[in-house]
Amino acid sequence: MNKPLPDVALTEISPALVSLDWVGMQGVEVPIRLAEASIRHPVHAHVDLQVDLADPSVKGIHMSRLYRLLDGYAERQIVSPDTLAALLEAMVESHLDCHSSHARLTLSFNLLCRRPALITEGLSGWKSYPVKLDATWHAGRLCLDSSVDITYSSTCPCSAALSRQLLEEAFAARFGRQSFVDPMQVATWLRENASFATPHSQRSVATVQVRVAEQAAELGLMTLIDLVEQALGTPVQTAVKRADEQAFARLNGQNLMYVEDAARKVQQALEGRYAASSVSVRHFESLHPHDAAAQTSNYLS
């Protein structure tokens, strides 16, 4: 005969009668499938999920209920705004005995997709984008934000100008006294000396967050990523040959940017497309031992 197991969450009262904003679990690992037309493979996600504990007399929530709901969701559902809303609502309903009224969850994962080389046909490689989905259920409504980290190259405009000045001075020193300059001679000199000075550039990261519409059929992650990469103009590459590396060098020269420029370009690209957006960029300076950073947001406080 099975003996009944004690459940102190039901039989005991907390000595401190205080309601709690959020209670739940962090870092639960599950495989998930995304509502993204171009992403067919499952991804490995870490999930945080909580409900409020409004009744101060209730000692604790039922974490196993949350876990089972998440496990079933990952097994049977594709992550989209409507399925996330259903999961969050079920989390609240599973804790009516705790007088819970709202729930939230965060999914963190790396989104892998193939990116083609700039020039070489048939050449591509995998690129990883760290993604976070923050979903909240309150008063019967879903609030969903997605954020993604996008890596790009930034070349300093000031350093480029200083490098051009040095090249100009070197060119004048070599050819300034000649009344006629042979174009072939100039071409040879440039081939050997155009790198007399080079501007500093560095790998950089833009963290972009946007509000996802409740009625959206998909998460729109690849749409967001493509939009930001097009705005910046210099996304880091995967597989390259020399022709692709040369094309990347040209893109860097055509898209010189301070950290301020990068933040403004991205936010401008987002305007009018999302109800709310924020941009945070970091340039991992090769000139300095510290980073340059800029932020902008139109989220309401």
Swiss-Prot record:
Which reaction(s) are listed as its catalytic activity?
A: GTP + H2O = 7,8-dihydroneopterin 3'-triphosphate + formate + H(+)
Q: Where is this site: May be catalytically important?
A: C156
Query: What pathway is it annotated to?
Result: Cofactor biosynthesis; 7,8-dihydroneopterin triphosphate biosynthesis; 7,8-dihydroneopterin triphosphate from GTP: step 1/1
What is an example of a GO molecular function annotated in this UniProt entry?
GTP cyclohydrolase I activity
Pfam families on file: GCHY-1
Q: Which GO terms describe its biological process?
A: tetrahydrofolate biosynthetic process
Enumerate the UniProt keywords alphabetically: Hydrolase
Coiled coil, from the record: none
| Domain of life per record | Bacteria
InterPro entries per the UniProt record, alphabetical:
GTP_cyclohydrolase_FolE2, GTP_cyclohydrolase_FolE2/MptA
| EC number per UniProt | 3.5.4.16
- The record's top EC class is hydrolase
Protein family membership: Belongs to the GTP cyclohydrolase IV family.
Any idea what job this protein has?
Answer: Converts GTP to 7,8-dihydroneopterin triphosphate.
The name this protein goes by in its record: GTP cyclohydrolase FolE2
Gene from which the chain derives: folE2
